[in-house]
Amino acid sequence: MTYIQERGSTHVYHVNRMSKEEMDHMISLCVHEQPAYCVAACPFKMDTKEMLYYAAKGNFKKALAIYEKITPFPMILCDGCTAPCEDNCKLCELGDGVSIREVERAIVRYGEPGRRSSVFRMRKKKKAAIFGSGLFPLFLAGELEKKMYPTTIYCKEEDYESYIAAAAGHLLESDRSNEAKRLKSMDLSFEFGCSLNLSFIREKMELADVVCASEEVAKMLAPEEAADVEIMLREQAKIVSGPAESVMDAAFAAKRAALTVDLLVQNLSPHSNRGSEGAVTTKLYTNMEGIHGSNKIFCGQDGYSKEEAVEEAKRCIQCHCDECMKGCVYLSEYQKHPGLLAREIYNNTQIIMGDHPMNKPMNACALCGQCTVICPNGFDMSQVCKSARENMVSTDKMPLAPHEFALMDMLFSNSEAFLSRLQPGYETCRYVFFPGCQAGAIAPDVVMQAYEDLSNRVAGGVALMLGCCGAISEWAGRYEMTEKVNEQLKQELARLGDPIIIAGCPSCMKQLKESIGAHVIGIWEILREIGLPQQAKGLEIPVAIHDACGARGDAQTQDMIRQLLSDMGCIVEDTEYSRDLSPCCGYGGLTAYANKDMAAKMTEKCLERSDAPYITYCMACRDRFAREGRESRHILELLYGANASNMPDISEKRYNRLILKQTLLKNIWNEEPIMEKKDYTVAYTEEAIHMMDERMILKSDVERVLSDYRENQEAILDEETKELVTRSRLGNVTFWVRFVETEDGYLVHRAYSHRMNIMKRVGQ
């Protein structure tokens, strides 16, 4: 047996196979973090969705805190808000959108204003002066105070109440009083009752680093220059000013002006580094299937009561995109949208020294491609994880442990269990039957009957090749091993005369097409041409189809499988998430080896779609379903009337491959295989067999350990159980076996393994 050598952890191959640009492009396809439609329409980018979420729970304090993030004066803004968000509410497609503005007003009316933070904030050194009154100066004063600029306001008004009234005289007196209290609590300096003439203003301008003014004062200071509406600045006069037409315009202009102040004090261009201002276009996708329209709650002249506001807020459907997470166990288990998970996985690949916490999530993906089909933008999590695995391998940061057993199984399939023969009587063959490694491991009798049928009924000759297509090393990111498999398969195909491959597995079809560019067809295509075998018979009860991941995007194969089942008299029911949306059974991407719990949940997700027996056309799917106690059949079992063993363990799977090879050599090519015989027997308790299968310990591993024991006689006697314990290191793993000696050989009670090396002292 050839073992895979694990590279040293200190040796680094500086070959990065994942570029940041490619990852950024992929992450940009995920729309989960895109703003909701109402949020995108708001020039202030208020998180309307979150505000309505808290309002629906009756938590007006938190809802108000969200509203206060966008404006220093919520009563004034909500009174003059034109609610562009309402027209963009997704519910408008089904009826009435949410009355966001009225809910907003109720939040401001009933919500408890948050206390100003007691945390010390460092004031900026640069000073600002604001001349005049009105909506724009008021909002700007609040914005600059948030940014911690020492700000002085010069105005004609005599007190805070008058200053608020000059800006928002339309408010109720009680509301004006509340906003005046809010203004008074701010860290601002006011000089009331000023005579705002030119000499006074110019004198005070000398005391400030940045000058801001109402439009009226600005026109007096710079009558021939208008403010640039993009930056709210008269650039020649260096005066920040804004419009006073409406509450919304003034509040938005104040935000722009505050950013301009930031840039000016840093001696930067006021046109640069402004980011995205105002309303934006969102790429968010929200599936409205199953959502019903409703009428908005009637609102009287006095606005909503608390209870009415809560009911109206409850109508919000909290627009978001989690389509991929609904169908994918992997994403739903980690509770992270693909964009975030992909970013964390990419960052994991860039860690040079230390732990790599995202190795397990990276290896838990089934690489099935379901997310790509479901996502409206085609986000491919499988490509992210596959590239990350390759990157970790190429930089020598991927441990061998998660995938070693599967890789060793592939090497076994392509060495001891490998077979490549022309059909007797042919020098070259038109076809070669490639059933796949899992078919030979789980259903060897089916493989034999299928090959016998094909070789008898297909013109031009059908060769046979038993082996692995290389999908295992491809999934593991071990691209060098995949290249060796590809080279082996190419050489064998050339020796057979470059025949057309008849694949018995959709994953093999996909892998062989993509990796070696072979001409591959499915066995189902051939059987549709030549007709069903005589023994073909469907089940007499309705069955559910589970579509294989390898057939995703292959409508021809999906249709052909259904047609074959119909021809056999099967009553077929399609399930939710079928065809291209079909989930993975848990075997794909080597999830079953790297994360057994995740794989079990994937299998459960597949089986919960129907109570009927499952028909598959992937042998790995059929095996995983049978292990969960569900009646399942591979379509070839129905076509050839031969049932596979229900639950072959990992040792039986290898044994089945060897027996299949030896039987075919003997029966078809008249070659008598040489069988190695031992002069002792090894038996296993039921507990040992179950434990070995669970821990992926082969009988051949145990027998190698016992063979070493026979040579060195090294073992520990457990006085209590009278069992012997011996060990041996095979490849990268030390195996331990607990056994007793019998008359004929050994009885194994338990077996376990560790990735450790036992060192012996010299001379002891």
Which residues does each PLM region occupy?
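Acyltransferase donor/substrate-recognition loop-hinge adjacent to the catalytic core
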Residues: 531-542
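Cofactor-cradling patches in redox/metallo enzymes
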Residues: 166-174, 438-525, 550-569, 573-663
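Conserved small-residue-rich
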Residues: 40-41, 127-151, 157, 286-342, ...
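Ferredoxin-type iron-sulfur electron-transfer modules and their immediate structural context
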Residues: 1-120, 127, 181, 213-364
